[in-house]
């Protein structure tokens, strides 16, 4: 709010690793990108893959084609494979960061929610639709991510109530839930 009053753009970053779930954020990206009050960036990153004998207990990352998929959006490559170095998100001075998925275990330390939340507000739009009772909501609301977010965008009033119940169970009371629909169905 203060930035727009001072004619400063609001910096929003989409941290993306999985082209298959982009439709859950695509319309959100489009709306923000077309609004002159926002400076929107996509940072394409690789993801940890489960390895035999190690599971996810390692620091090896593999691309799911993110860099190529978001190239037409002018994405920033978040990982230099030759130097094995991560792009510093802080260089973009983010006000808000959207993650495609809520799984800290699959990201490098610098991109884990507890580190990003120190300098930006984390927003989350679920990548999967919860058909009541199918267990998706419980799977996609890990406590170690939920405690760091500022905004959780829910698909309907029932979903909003269920998310608030999960937040109460986790003893988290500072996340704002907002009913917005399910962006994957916007098109």
Put a short name on every predicted segment.
Residues 1-11:
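Non-catalytic membrane-proximal stalk/linker segments that position and tether the catalytic domains
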